[in-house]
Amino acid sequence: MSGAQRGQRGGERRGGRDDRRGQGADKTAYIERVVAINRVAKVVKGGRRFSFTALVVVGDGEGLVGVGYGKAKEVPAAIAKGVEEAKKHFFRVPRIQGTIPHPVQGEKAAGVVLLRPAAPGTGVIAGGPVRAVLECAGIHDVLSKSLGSSNQINIVHATVEALRMLEQPEAVAARRGLPVEEVAPAALLKARVEVPAGVSEEVSS
C-alpha cells in the first residue's frame, strides 16, 4: 500500500471519529446567549496584560437554565469557559403554559428584577439581560421590570434569584392554607407544564 493510500484511509478513519463526535454534540445542544463581553487589564511588572471576560446564559428552552462567567486571553475561549460554568449551575424553573406561576422579585447587590405572569401571546417584555435568561429558560410570556443598578452582571443574577424563588401553585397553596385556584388562574392550571420534582435543586449537566 502506498503512502498516499495509507494517508487517505487514515483520513477516512479520522473523519469517522469526527462524525461521531458531531452526532453526540447534537444530543446535548443548548441555547446560548452572550450577555456581555468586556476587556480587562492586569498591571504587571512588564506592563499590562489584557484578557476578556464573558457573561453567558445557557438553557434548553424547556425550563433548564444556568449562568456562567468566563475569562481568557481570547474572546472565544472566554465564551467557552462561560458556557461550561453555566452548565455546572443548571437549575429547573417552574412554568405554567409558557409563563411563571406567580409574581416574584429577585435581588443581587444593587440590582432588582420584578417578574409577573402574562397571558399567552404577550411575549417576553424585558430588557436584554433579563430577556436572555428568560428565553433560555423557555419562558415565552412574562412582564418584567428592572430597578436599581443597570450593571448587566447584577441584573442577570437578580433574574436568576427571582427564578429560583418560583414555586409550583400546590406548594404556595399548601404554605398559605388556600385552595390552588386562589393561587393561580384556573386557565393556567389546566394547561400547566409539568416540571420534575425538586425544581429548586441544581442538576448536573
UniProtKB/Swiss-Prot annotation:
A biological process term (GO) from this entry: translation
Region (Disordered): 1-25
Segments of skewed composition (Basic and acidic residues): 9-24
Domain S5 DRBM: 30-93
UniProt keyword annotation of Transmembrane helix present: no
Signal peptide: none
SUPFAM superfamilies: dsRNA-binding domain-like, Ribosomal protein S5 domain 2-like
Database matches in PROSITE patterns: RIBOSOMAL_S5 (PS00585), S5_DSRBD (PS50881)
Keyword annotations from UniProtKB, A to Z: Ribonucleoprotein, Ribosomal protein, RNA-binding, rRNA-binding
UniProt keyword RNA-binding, yes or no: yes
GO cellular component: small ribosomal subunit
Molecular function terms, GO-annotated: rRNA binding; structural constituent of ribosome
InterPro entries cross-referenced by the UniProt entry: Ribosomal_Su5_D2-typ_SF, Ribosomal_uS5, Ribosomal_uS5_bac-type, Ribosomal_uS5_C, Ribosomal_uS5_N, Ribosomal_uS5_N_CS, Ribsml_uS5_D2-typ_fold_subgr
Domain observations: The N-terminal domain interacts with the head of the 30S subunit; the C-terminal domain interacts with the body and contacts protein S4. The interaction surface between S4 and S5 is involved in control of translational fidelity.
Function, as annotated: With S4 and S12 plays an important role in translational accuracy.
Subunit relationships: Part of the 30S ribosomal subunit. Contacts proteins S4 and S8.
HAMAP family in alphabetical order: Ribosomal_uS5_B
Similarity section: Belongs to the universal ribosomal protein uS5 family.
Protein name (database record): Small ribosomal subunit protein uS5
